[in-house]
Curated annotation (Swiss-Prot):
Protein name: Ribonuclease PH
Listed GO MF terms: 3'-5'-RNA exonuclease activity; tRNA binding; tRNA nucleotidyltransferase activity
Alphabetized CDD domains for the sequence: RNase_PH_bact
Organism taxonomic ancestry: Bacteria, Pseudomonadati, Pseudomonadota, Gammaproteobacteria, Oceanospirillales
Originating organism: Alcanivorax borkumensis (strain ATCC 700651 / DSM 11573 / NCIMB 13689 / SK2)
Keywords: Nucleotidyltransferase, RNA-binding, rRNA processing, Transferase, tRNA processing, tRNA-binding
Binding site for phosphate: 86, 124-126
Length: 238
């Protein structure tokens, strides 16, 4: 039995609240159960130096956690003067994941900044950030199209992400903190709307996992991401 009482293949209650803030071209509050992340997509003219003159855009991401998003307060990384390794790893993952869904030529020489700020953490903050940032990105592209700054939609498809793991020898979907902290295997999976894999991150926390368990976890993730993408489509009115 899972601590939450969910079935092994059941997502937490999921929501995408669009236009959550007024200034960003795209903003979404995404909630996976008690994990809540504010995702914004900001558009700026210009690209990094290595892309200047190439007629294509860029997308990058930043990730942070509010000091009291967790059970005990964590100091701000800005106060310490540098980002931690976990933060750098997660924001690179978010950027990689969403770049896979963008036609950079259609974007022109513009940069999209995705900012993912964790308001409340209960496991799965990186996967929630990816799923929420994708919806914010769609709204930013809609802004560019409606203001006639671009002619063609740069989005090649939606992207969803979810965690899976072995909890008490059972494959489970969308781990919360109670499960994640006691999981024998933890895996994060990112996929496109078309069913392609963008990222698979998996590691054994205790005993090694088998090929059969790995296949079961990936199937669980694939089905869960299908549900997440349907929820994104509903939120977007597609």
């Amino acid at each position: 039995m899972r601590p939450s009482g969910r079935a092994p293949d059941q997502l937490r209650e999921l929501s995408f609240t669009r236009n959550y803030t007024v200034h960003a071209e795209g903003s979404v509050l995404v909630a996976f159960g008690n994990t809540k992340v504010l995702c914004t997509a900001s558009v700026e003219d210009g690209v990094p130096r290595f892309l200047k003159g190439k007629g294509q855009g860029w997308l990058t991401a930043e990730y942070s956690m509010l000091p009291r998003s967790t059970h005990t307060r964590s100091g701000r990384e800005a106060t310490r003067g540098k980002q931690g390794g976990r933060t750098l790893e997660i924001q690179r993952l978010i950027g990689r994941s969403l770049r896979a869904a963008v036609d950079m030529k259609a974007l022109g020489e513009r940069t999209i900044y995705l900012d993912c700020d964790v308001l409340q953490a209960d496991g799965g903050t990186r996967t929630a950030s990816i799923s929420g940032a994708c919806v914010a990105l769609v709204d930013a592209f809609t802004y560019l199209l409606e203001t006639k700054k671009i002619k063609n939609d740069p989005l090649t498809g939606l992207v969803g992400a979810v965690s899976v793991g072995m909890y008490k020898d059972t494959p489970v979907l969308d781990l919360d903190y109670a499960e994640d902290s006691n999981a024998g295997t933890d895996m994060n999976v990112v996929m496109t709307q078309q069913g392609g894999f963008i990222e698979i991150q998996g590691s054994a926390e205790g005993a090694p996992f088998t090929r059969e368990q790995s296949d079961n976890l990936l199937e669980l993730a694939e089905n869960g991401i299908g549900e997440i993408i349907k929820a994104q489509q509903v939120a977007l009115g597609w």
